[in-house]
Amino acid sequence: MESTDKLTDTNAILAYLYETFPLCFIAEGETKPLKIGLFQDLAERLADDSKVSKTQLRVALRRYTSSWRYLKGVKAGAKRIDLDGNECAELEQEHIDHAILTLKESQDKAKAKRQALAPKKPAKKVAPKRAPAVKKERPAPVAAPVIKLVPAKLEDLKQKQRVNVKLGATPVPGVVTDINKEDVLVQLDSGLSIKVRAEHILL
C-alpha cells in the first residue's frame, strides 16, 4: 500500500518532482526555462496527490527556479517547456536579463557571506621586548575526519545498503531496495522510491 504521508522537506518534494516530471524538472546538468504559469498546471496535475500541498509545491518550485543551475539555463536560444518537456514559448529578452542580474546578485551575496565567515587576521601590535617566556606545548587539535562522498559503481551496490542519491546540489540519504541491470531503485528516508543510475549514487 502506497504511503499517503505528506512530504514536508523541500529536497524530498524536489526529488518527487524529478521522478514524476523528469522531462520538465531536470535533476542534474543543464535545466530548461519553465513555462509561465507552470505552477497552476502543476497544482492541477497533482490535485489528487495527497503527498504534496500547494504551499510546499510553491516553495519547491521557487527553490528550483532560484538555483544557479536554473538561472544559467535562462539564456538566449533557450525555450520554455511545459510539464511534459514540450517547448511552448520563446524566452523574452527581459527575462534573460532578469535571470543574469539575479544570478549575479545571488553569487555576490554568497561570496560576501563566505568572506564574512572567514576568520579575520588580528592587526599586529608592536609590544615592548620582554625576556623570552617558557612556552607550554599544547597538543595539536585533532581535525574531525572529512567524509567525502564518491560516485558508486554498480558492482559495489547491494540491496539494503545505505547510500546517498545525488539530486541537485544536496545528496539525499536512502536505502537500495532493488538493482535491475543499470538501474538502481532507492527508497529515500522521506519514504519516496526513486530509480536512478549507479553514477547518481554516492558512497
UniProtKB/Swiss-Prot annotation:
InterPro entries: ProQ (IPR023529), ProQ/FinO (IPR016103), ProQ/FinO_sf (IPR036442), ProQ_C (IPR035236). One of its GO terms (molecular function) is RNA strand-exchange activity. The keyword Methyltransferase does not apply. GO terms for cellular component: cytosol. It comes from the Bacteria. It holds the Pfam family ProQ. Keywords: Chaperone, Cytoplasm, RNA-binding. The keyword Cytoplasm applies. Residues 111-138 are annotated as: Disordered. GO terms for biological process: post-transcriptional regulation of gene expression. It is found in: Cytoplasm. RNA chaperone with significant RNA binding, RNA strand exchange and RNA duplexing activities. Belongs to the ProQ family. This is RNA chaperone ProQ. It comes from Shewanella frigidimarina (strain NCIMB 400). The lineage of its organism: Bacteria, Pseudomonadati, Pseudomonadota, Gammaproteobacteria, Alteromonadales.
